[in-house]
């Protein structure tokens, strides 16, 4: 009996690993169908008890594997831009720019996952799939991300994604009006405006 239980557990483990791998492969394949797009987004952040913490809107331009421009227009304006090497964060209100190396961006950051769509990043997660919904749980609990959920259609259109942090805070992003096609390269370049403070962490 014990031997049968051991074999059953082993089979279950192998099956579940295969299911995770298939789901991750399907997710990566869907995302690969669209290499560049522009979309509008709305953001809603809720606390552990479900209370609204913040809501916002903005625009997103993306070109895989490493180019993006995430521009928040409300409630406050800001921009997170990757030119392929440097990750720029610009906050006009405080007149400050932060520059870091994109390669140092962690793979447990949801947006970096979507942008890079790299197998080595997805391998760090157990991925479950139900139709167009994918649920990712980090294999390591060392990071701040507890769970990541994303809805992607079979043609590669991202409808929404949600990041849940270890403390229960949840950030949901809904994408609308996604337009697939060539994106102007100017969207992925950034030069700090004169007069702003530059916090250059690329040392």
From Swiss-Prot:
Entry's localization field: Periplasm
Keyword hit for Chaperone: yes
Main subcellular location of this protein, as a coarse class: periplasm
Gene3D superfamilies linked: Lipoprotein localisation LolA/LolB/LppX
Keyword annotations of the record: Chaperone, Periplasm, Protein transport, Signal, Transport
Gene Ontology CC: outer membrane-bounded periplasmic space
Family as reported in the entry's similarity comment: Belongs to the LolA family.
Summary of subunit composition and partner proteins: Monomer.
PANTHER family to which the protein is assigned, alphabetical: OUTER-MEMBRANE LIPOPROTEIN CARRIER PROTEIN
HAMAP family the UniProt entry points to: LolA
Function recorded in the entry: Participates in the translocation of lipoproteins from the inner membrane to the outer membrane. Only forms a complex with a lipoprotein if the residue after the N-terminal Cys is not an aspartate (The Asp acts as a targeting signal to indicate that the lipoprotein should stay in the inner membrane).
UniProt protein name: Outer-membrane lipoprotein carrier protein
